[in-house]
């Protein structure tokens, strides 16, 4: 397994989407940038907000695409092409309906599970699914008919606090991820529940 060299947080651009559940992946990268005291800045060549940080002794590229979710792959592919990154050097943070708020999971490879941002990313990477994922639990509304409104809705105060607590725990596991200690990172994160 290759070392993670870039962390990408998926979401939708604009203030009307900033606080929606679908932007939970972007919240991870924004929190990491704040923790690193390095602001994300608009970078046209990567179609998003970008920063290079030094975190836990590693140089890491951070990106929040400013494309809409279903076009995230364009930004991911642009970053990979510019820095000669392979898909297995990426950690992509995204919202996950199948996990409760207050929890998060790492995953290696796999399908898109109906997530439009992942679907477009897989396509833009030539159908290479070998990237790592950081799945941020947002819970499920209970009915497939309610999913679109749910992911584009804002979590309540307690739900957002639980999601933020899970993101904080993600940041505490990132040094292990960057060191290649996936077992340690997974063991810690997967046992956390806010």
From Swiss-Prot:
GO biological process: protein quality control for misfolded or incompletely synthesized proteins; rescue of stalled ribosome
Residues of the site described as Discriminates between blocked and unblocked aminoacyl-tRNA: 12
Reaction catalysis annotation: an N-acyl-L-alpha-aminoacyl-tRNA + H2O = an N-acyl-L-amino acid + a tRNA + H(+)
Key word Glycoprotein present: no
Site positions per UniProt: Stabilizes the basic form of H active site to accept a proton: 95
EC number: 3.1.1.29
Keyword annotations from UniProtKB, A to Z: Cytoplasm, Hydrolase, RNA-binding, tRNA-binding
GO molecular function, one term: peptidyl-tRNA hydrolase activity
GO cellular component: cytoplasm
Binding site for tRNA: 17, 68, 70, 116
Active site residues of this protein: 22
InterPro entries from the UniProt entry: Pept_tRNA_hydro, Pept_tRNA_hydro_CS, Pept_tRNA_hydro_sf
Compartmental location: Cytoplasm
Subunit-level organization: Monomer.
Similarity comment: Belongs to the PTH family.
Role description: Hydrolyzes ribosome-free peptidyl-tRNAs (with 1 or more amino acids incorporated), which drop off the ribosome during protein synthesis, or as a result of ribosome stalling. Catalyzes the release of premature peptidyl moieties from peptidyl-tRNA molecules trapped in stalled 50S ribosomal subunits, and thus maintains levels of free tRNAs and 50S ribosomes.
Protein name, UniProt field: Peptidyl-tRNA hydrolase
Lineage: Bacteria, Pseudomonadati, Pseudomonadota, Gammaproteobacteria, Oceanospirillales
């Amino acid at each position: 397994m290759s070392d993670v060299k870039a962390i990408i947080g998926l979401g939708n651009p604009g203030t009307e989407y900033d606080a929606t559940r679908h932007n939970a992946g972007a919240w991870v990268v924004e929190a990491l940038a704040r923790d690193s005291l390095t602001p994300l800045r608009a970078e046209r060549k990567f179609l998003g907000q970008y920063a290079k940080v030094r975190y836990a002794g590693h140089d890491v590229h951070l990106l929040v695409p400013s494309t809409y979710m279903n076009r995230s792959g364009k930004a991911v592919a642009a970053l990979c092409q510019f820095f000669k990154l392979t898909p297995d050097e990426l950690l992509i943070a995204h919202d996950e309906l199948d996990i409760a708020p207050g929890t998060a999971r790492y995953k290696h490879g796999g399908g898109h599970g109906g997530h439009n941002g992942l679907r477009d990313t897989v396509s833009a990477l030539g159908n290479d699914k070998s990237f790592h994922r950081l799945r941020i639990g947002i819970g499920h509304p209970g009915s497939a008919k309610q999913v679109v409104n749910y992911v584009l809705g804002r979590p309540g105060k307690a739900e957002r606090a639980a999601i933020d607590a899970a993101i904080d725990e993600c940041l505490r596991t990132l040094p292990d991820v960057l060191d290649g200690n996936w077992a340690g990172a997974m063991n810690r994160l997967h046992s956390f529940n806010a």
